Amino acid sequence: MQAKAQEEQKGEELSQFLQALEEEFALCQEGGGDKREADGPSLENAEAEELANRRAYYLQLKEERNVLVEESKHVTSLHMSSKHNIEHAKVLGMAKKLETLYYVVNHVRSFNTYQLTEEGKEYLRDGSPEHVTLRYVMEQEGCTLEDLKKLFGKKGEIGLNINLKKKKIELRKSDKRLFPHVEGSAHSLVDETRCYLQKVEAHGNDEGALVSHLKGILPPEKGEKKEEDEANNLIKELKKRKLIEAKKISYIYIIRTNLFTKEIKKQITDLTYLLIKNEEYKKYQVKKYNFFSSGKKMNKGNIHLLIRQMRTFKDVFVSLGFEEMNTHNYVESSFWCFDALYIPQQHPSRDLQDTFFIKVPEMCQEEFTDQSYIENVKRVHSVGDYGSFGWNYQWELKSTKKNVLRTHTTANSCRALFQLAKEYQKTGSIIPKKFFSIDRVFRNENLDSTHLAEFHQVEGLIIDRNLGLSHLIGTLSAFYKYIGISKLRFKPTFNPYTEPSMEVYGYHEENKKWLEVGNSGIFRPEMLRAMGFPPEVSVIAWGLSLERPTMIKYSIRNIRDLFGYRSVI
C-alpha cells in the first residue's frame, strides 16, 4: 500500500511538473521572457563542436523516431526550481524521466559560483596582510623584521612575503630593516585584495558578472581577451591563497519536442484479451520492443587475467623478433641458478629465508654440465679472471649441486647462452639472437597484498657484438611502449651478474606517480667469458613480474586476488 501511495504521489508531481513546463514553453512562444536567465551561460554560447553534436543528435531523433526538437521553446532546471518551488534534484529527475519518453531533450550545462572562505571574510573585514604590513612600514618609515613579526604574527609574515615578491618593500641585509618602495603616503594606499574580495562577495553567484566587474578594477590591458585572462588568473590566485572557494553548479536546458503532452499514459508491456475486449488499452501506452539492447553477459569460460596478460607480452616479444626459451624445469641446481650468474655462494639470496631448497633429491646429478665450464666458474669466483678480481673465497662443488626451486628465469637464460657459446666454439661465428621467457619462479617470502611465494617473471635478452647501454635503453623504450608505458626513467642499481645495471620506472597516468616496472643491465664478462664467448660479445637483458602490470591494468589492489575465481569474474 505504501509503495502504491508513493507511486501515485510521484505521478501527481510529474503531472504538475508537466503543467508548469507547458506554461513556461507558452511564455517562450509568446515572447514573454527569456528563460535562459542569468544563472548560467546561454545555450547559444556553446562551443562549435558541441553545437554540431547537438544538431546531429536532433537529426538522428527525427530520422529514427520522428521526433522534432523545438529549439525556441526551452527553460532551465534552475528557473523551474526557483519559480515553482521544487527541489532542483527533483526537477532533474523528472526532466530525465520525460526525456526517456521523448517529450523533451535535455542538455547538461554547468557554471561556477564563488564565495569567501573564513580567511577571506577576515581579510575583507580587517584588511589583507599585504596592505596592513605595507601601511605599517610606510607609517614607521622603516622597521625591523622582529617588530613586524611581533606585531602581526603569521599574518605579518604572509604580508611581508607578498610585498617582497612584488618589490613594494625592500629588505636591507646589513641591519635586517625593512623600507617601503612605493610612491605616495600610507593613507593613499588602496587595499587591492580587499577590493577583489568585495567583488566576489557581491557578484560571486554569477561567474560572468564577477569576471566583468574584476576587469573593471584591474589595470587596463590591450585587448578584451587579455583583460579576461587577467581576471581569470586573479580568481585562480585568490583560490590558491584559499581566500575564495568555487562551487560547480550543474543544471540542464529542458527543450520541448513535438511529442510533448500535459499527461503521461501508463506504459504496459503486454496486450491481454481483456484489455482489447474492454478497449482499456486506449488508456495506456504500449511499450515498444527494443531490439538493440544487449542481454546480461554471462560470466563463465573467461580467460584468466594472467593468461590474457601473458599472451599480450608474448605477442609483443614475437612482433619484435624474439624467440621463446625453454623454461619447463622448475627445479634447478644452484649452479645454473646462482654460480653461473656470478652470484657468490655466501650471497644472501642463497639463504633459507629467500630460497626454497629441495630435500629429495637434495643434489643434482654428477655430470650436470661440461667439466671445463665448471672449472671456469670456480676460477672466476675464487681468484678471478678475464680482468676481474673475483669474489676471493673457497668455492665448493657441494654447494653448487644443491637443488632449488628456481628463484628467477635467468637460470634458463644462462642455459640458452651456454648452448650458443658451444656453437661459437665449433663454428667461430656469433649469430645475433633475441630470447624471451615468461614462466613461474619461487621465492621464500612472507605473503601480503603485494608479495607471493610464487609469481611469474617476464625476461628478455639480446646477444650481439658490442652492445652498450644506449642499445639497452632503446630496446627498453620500444618494449615498454608496446605494452602502453611511454614515459620511462632509469635509475642505477646493483646486480651481481650485470654491470651496468638499471631499475626501470614507468609513469602511471591514473595514479599520477612513477612505479618500478623492471630491472635491467648488461651481463658481466665474468659470466659470459666463462661460457667461452669472446670479449666483444655483449648481452643486454631485462626482467619484470607479470603480476604487477596485470594489477595496474585491471585495478587490482591485492595480488592474491589474481588467483582463484575472482580473477575471471
From Swiss-Prot:
Mechanisms controlling activity:
Inhibited by bicyclic azetidine BRD1389, which competes for L-phenylalanine.
- InterPro entries on file: aa-tRNA-synth_II, aa-tRNA-synth_II/BPL/LPL, Phe-tRNA-synth_IIc_asu, Phenylalanyl-tRNA_Synthase
Subcellular location(s): the record lists: Cytoplasm, Cytosol
Q: Does the keyword rRNA processing apply?
A: no
Recorded source organism is: Plasmodium vivax (strain Salvador I)
Q: What is this protein called?
A: Phenylalanine--tRNA ligase alpha subunit
Can you quote a single GO CC term? phenylalanine-tRNA ligase complex
Name the NCBIfam families for this protein: pheS (TIGR00468), PRK04172.1 (NF003210)
Residues binding Mg(2+) are E499
EC number, as in UniProt: 6.1.1.20
Per the UniProt record, one Pfam family is tRNA-synt_2d
Question: In practice, how is this protein used?
Answer: The identification of residues that recognize the inhibitor lays a foundation for the development of drugs against Plasmodium species as well as related apicomplexan parasites that infect humans since they are conserved among apicomplexan alpha subunits.
Instruction: Kindly give the PANTHER family that the UniProt entry links to this protein.
Output: PHENYLALANINE--TRNA LIGASE ALPHA SUBUNIT (PTHR11538:SF40), PHENYLALANYL-TRNA SYNTHETASE (PTHR11538)
**According to its UniProt record, which reaction does this protein catalyse?**
tRNA(Phe) + L-phenylalanine + ATP = L-phenylalanyl-tRNA(Phe) + AMP + diphosphate + H(+)
The prosthetic group or cofactor this protein requires is: Mg(2+)
Query: Where L-phenylalanine is bound, by residue?
Result: T410, Q457, V458, E459, Y497, F523
Question: Primary place of residence?
Answer: cytoplasm
Record text on subunit structure and interactions = Heterotetramer; dimer of two heterodimers formed by alpha and beta subunits.
Q: Which domain of life is it from?
A: Eukaryota
Alphabetically list the UniProt keywords.
Aminoacyl-tRNA synthetase, ATP-binding, Cytoplasm, Ligase, Magnesium, Metal-binding, Nucleotide-binding, Protein biosynthesis
- Which GO molecular-function terms appear in the entry? ATP binding; magnesium ion binding; phenylalanine-tRNA ligase activity; tRNA binding
